[in-house]
């Protein structure tokens, strides 16, 4: 009887040790791959006074913003946008079905810089060809959406969707592409926040 109890305890202990070892070695406990890589830290941060742009203005921001550097708006050149800090990630472009590495600031960092209040719900993004799309701010806050200025290490000219475009991390999250493909606005010239 004593031998059976000892054998039973030894088997139970072996099973527990085996389960612990398997769980410890499983990929679920591995360090997750980061969604994006930080390329540069912010030099222009939320709460800072916005300087006047020194280069060509590529973005005008209006609406529910808590700061301005223009008459009733924010105007930004490429250097200002990049000074918010840049990240990059690889994503399969839904329009070209090809992987690209996009780089630019996170839209959430831009919203913070612009002092967008909690009562704002929508970004109305306007492109150079007057394409307009309304993007929920909740999605901008939930996902690491890029205000991309570069594609595969090159600034995007207007002829290839520049100077800027919104990029969603399709490779890392499940998106309803019927809805979200419309949010991939490019040739962005203005954003109105409501």
Predicted regions and their residues:
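C-terminal motif of bacterial Sec signal peptides marking the signal peptidase cleavage site
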Residues: 21-24
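N-terminal intrinsically disordered, low-complexity segments enriched in P/E/S/T
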Residues: 26-194
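Bacterial N-terminal signal peptides that target proteins for export
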Residues: 2-14
């Amino acid at each position: 009887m004593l031998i059976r109890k000892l054998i039973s305890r030894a088997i139970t202990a072996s099973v527990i040790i085996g389960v612990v070892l398997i769980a410890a070695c499983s990929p679920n406990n591995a360090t997750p791959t980061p969604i994006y890589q930080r390329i540069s830290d912010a030099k222009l941060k939320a709460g800072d006074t916005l300087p006047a742009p020194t280069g060509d203005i590529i973005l005008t921001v209006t609406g529910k913003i808590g700061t301005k550097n223009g008459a009733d708006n924010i105007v930004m050149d490429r250097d200002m946008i990049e000074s918010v800090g840049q990240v990059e990630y690889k994503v399969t472009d839904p329009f070209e079905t090809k992987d690209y590495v996009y780089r630019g600031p996170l839209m959430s960092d831009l919203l913070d810089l612009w002092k967008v209040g909690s009562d704002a719900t929508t970004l109305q993004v306007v492109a150079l060809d007057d394409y307009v799309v309304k993007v929920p701010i909740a999605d901008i806050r939930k996902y690491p959406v890029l205000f991309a200025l570069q594609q595969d290490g090159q600034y995007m000219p207007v002829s290839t969707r520049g100077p800027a475009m919104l990029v969603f991390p399709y490779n890392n999250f499940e998106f309803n592409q019927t809805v979200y493909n419309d949010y991939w606005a490019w040739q962005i010239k203005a954003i109105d926040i409501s």
